[in-house]
Amino acid sequence: MPARKRPTPEGTVTARQTLLDGLARDADILELVSELAPLHPRDNTFPGEVFLHLAADALDWCGASQADPLPLEGLRERFLPECTFRGRQNTKLQYAVLAAAALHGGTEPDLLDEVAWWQTDDLWQYALFTAVAYIRAAASRAGVPVCHVCQDLAQRPGHPAP
């Protein structure tokens, strides 16, 4: 991959901030996908890692833990009502949801091994949907507006570029 197409620290910051700013202003998810698409190098998981770490940060923000778990049942229906997933799309979303939870729990999922069988270049989109769902769920759990969670998460340092 040419150097100009590799993820950069600036791209990581931009991806994180663009998603948080978009959610804070209640932007349409598909609008965010279009806005963030130029950051995604072909045949690369970036910025998926950024969004999975952001989702894990949202779990941390709302205090989800083994002692006080965030229920996943109904997560998609409650927090991504504008999205419709069918067949393998459900499996991809489930993987991203569980990968973010694994990051929150202190493990590092093998994204490349997983997405190799997908035969598509869309992990980053499912990671984005996951971040949106977890941020909305965190806001619901805390009883605060989504923009409040986004503002708090924006103050936290992001994770380095992959």
Question: Which residue stretches match the model-derived regions?
Answer:
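Solvent-exposed interaction surfaces and binding hotspots enriched for charged
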Residues: 1-162
